[in-house]
Amino acid sequence: MLNKLKRAALGAHTPHDKATAASKPVPMPLPAQVRILMSQHIGAPAKALVKKGDEVFVGTKIGEAGGFVSANIHSSVSGTVAAVEAFRLSNGRMCDSVVIKTDGKQTVDPAVKAPEVTDKASFLAAVRECGLVGLGGAGFPTDVKLQPKQSVDTLLINASECEVWLTSDTQEMLECSDDIIRGIKAVLKYTGIPKCIIGIENNKPECIDLLCKKTKDDSTIEVKPLPSVYGTGAELILIEKCLGREVPHGGLPADAGAIVMNVTSVSTLGKYLATGMPVVQRTITVDGDACAKPQNVVAVSYTHLRAHETLSRSRMPSSA
């Protein structure tokens, strides 16, 4: 009976609705205006560095991390700062926000260039400058995650994408495998973690095959197919399935010798190390009953959901 309960706790069999798995990301129209929040991560809010009337570019740092557990914020558009003002978050709290009127040019900031990384200190500084946080949903600052007090022997890449509808991570693996590998190798090299396991649910055979080919000559990286059950992507379950270890109650993955990164997070890191472009856009899946044409889209940060042309406004909640 206990074994049955344990198996049930490690995932639930749910119907897969991955209709967008083959949908290559389509660029979303550039919004006329964006509101970029200074609190979009776990930890202290960033401190706004710009004022009304300032000109900004794609990649301009507009928010400075407000503490050790915090993150830098960068402009996703080029244009002019229309306002720096308080904004109420969904949890009822207030935070500063930067409103930018876009100029439609998407001019890249001249300061954007690949970081010079030579050792662990410069690597962690680059990750912090990038403003990278967990893109799987938690939003924890990546540079902090990569500095655990515990001894860690495994970098675990969460590529399971077990959520029933989402396929953006699938497209990230298919389209950006070189960035993923670059990010992984950098983490291993500069943190001293000896090995990496990429956990992918077995309903993504193309992703498994591609990443196996990309890593076949690297003994430090293993691609591990996982059962396609809902819940596999929860990091505590992922650790047990990939490493056979349990995280202590109230503990962190590092207490089980692992650091867990989402596959899009490590891909974004790989892109940043090659180009110097911080987190200013991402691929997301738009799907569901209110969407006439489910698809993956590439959107600059803080593009409004209602800008998606195939959404049925009448079937969306008023707050969306």
Give the predicted meaning of each segment.
Residues T303-T310:
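Conserved small/polar residues in nucleotide/adenosyl-binding loops
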Residues L155-D169, A290:
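Gly-rich Lys/Arg/Thr-decorated short loops/hinges at beta-loop-alpha junctions or inter-strand turns
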Residues P194-V300:
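Hydrophobic alpha-helical positions that pack around
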Residues G79-V81:
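Conserved hydrophobic positions within beta-strands
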Residues A83, R88-K145, K149-Q150, P205:
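Acidic low-complexity segments
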Residues K51-E64, A83:
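Short, well-structured beta-strand-loop connectors
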Residues M1-P45, L49:
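N-terminal, Lys/Arg-enriched amphipathic/low-complexity engagement segments
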